[in-house]
């Protein structure tokens, strides 16, 4: 069987149309179809040239053009030249618009935009896991945001929440016996946020944490004198850095995240 040609025309990359064409071609033994992709078409001149080529080569045109004017031009030009042109995405857009009572944006490349956004989120989530709890201080200088605070100030959940907003977050625990990593004093203060909490609230949280682990809630970890020592040390560190401090005593993670994002936009 002679190989036949299909021109895949798109105002984006053309991957969607090519996959559909290849899926259809796979239904024929030996798949006697050659696909030529014509991506990122923005003008009618290019469409007319493709129609002329399709006529000359007795080819089919399969296309994904989201702008109605471009779709109509291609269909009209193809019909005039006796070329078969198949609209892959247009009818579905119109059906969805009618059924859902929504107006399409008619903007090319939106799948690619969504894919990029998705991968940015995944990258940020992986970053937050990798640089959680001061595991690797090298992440401090690579982060969009650096969170610091004593234990149980919601650093990890806040890091994950911000990661879902496509922000790369590293967090560092502040402990009197451990010298803060030098990178903490090299990062710009505008990227660093200290998480402050009242001693009473922190005591309550830590005691509940110990109970949930089946441990004695009178351990040094949940001792008021120890907590005050940690918070005093924290105050010294954030003062040295010169970063903003947010009181998270009675704030939900979402509320704290909102404050941070607003400060970043300044």
Curated annotation (Swiss-Prot):
ADP binds at residues 149-156. Its EC number is 2.7.11.32, 2.7.4.27. One of its GO terms (molecular function) is ADP binding. The keyword Nucleotide-binding applies. It catalyses: N(tele)-phospho-L-histidyl/L-threonyl-[pyruvate, phosphate dikinase] + ADP = N(tele)-phospho-L-histidyl/O-phospho-L-threonyl-[pyruvate, phosphate dikinase] + AMP + H(+); N(tele)-phospho-L-histidyl/O-phospho-L-threonyl-[pyruvate, phosphate dikinase] + phosphate + H(+) = N(tele)-phospho-L-histidyl/L-threonyl-[pyruvate, phosphate dikinase] + diphosphate. Keywords: Kinase, Nucleotide-binding, Serine/threonine-protein kinase, Transferase. Coiled coil: none annotated. It comes from the Bacteria. Bifunctional serine/threonine kinase and phosphorylase involved in the regulation of the pyruvate, phosphate dikinase (PPDK) by catalyzing its phosphorylation/dephosphorylation. Belongs to the pyruvate, phosphate/water dikinase regulatory protein family. PDRP subfamily. This is Putative pyruvate, phosphate dikinase regulatory protein. It comes from Geobacillus thermodenitrificans (strain NG80-2).
């Amino acid at each position: 069987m002679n190989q036949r040609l299909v021109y895949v025309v798109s105002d984006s990359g053309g991957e969607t149309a090519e996959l559909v064409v290849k899926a259809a071609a796979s239904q024929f033994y030996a798949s006697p179809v050659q696909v030529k992709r014509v991506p990122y078409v923005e003008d009618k001149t290019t469409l007319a040239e493709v129609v002329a080529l399709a006529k000359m080569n007795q080819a089919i045109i399969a296309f994904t053009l989201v702008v109605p004017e471009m779709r109509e031009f291609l269909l009209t030009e193809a019909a005039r030249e006796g070329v078969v042109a198949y609209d892959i995405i247009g009818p579905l857009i119109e059906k969805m618009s009618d059924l859902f009572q929504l107006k399409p944006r008619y903007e090319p490349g939106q799948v690619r935009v969504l894919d990029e956004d998705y991968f940015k989120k995944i990258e940020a989530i992986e970053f937050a896991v990798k640089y959680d709890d001061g595991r690797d201080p090298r992440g401090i200088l690579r982060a969009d945001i650096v969170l610091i605070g004593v234990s149980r100030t919601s650093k990890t959940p806040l890091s994950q929440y911000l990661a879902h907003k496509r922000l790369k977050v590293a967090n560092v625990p502040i402990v009197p016996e451990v010298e803060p990593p030098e990178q903490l004093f090299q990062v710009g203060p505008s990227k660093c946020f200290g998480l402050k909490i009242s001693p009473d609230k922190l005591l309550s949280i830590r005691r509940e944490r110990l109970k949930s682990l089946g441990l004695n809630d009178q351990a040094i970890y949940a001792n008021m004198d120890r907590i005050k020592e940690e918070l005093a040390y924290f105050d010294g560190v954030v003062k040295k850095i010169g970063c903003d401090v947010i009181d998270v005593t009675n704030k939900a993670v979402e509320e704290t995240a909102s404050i941070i994002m607003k400060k970043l936009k300044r």
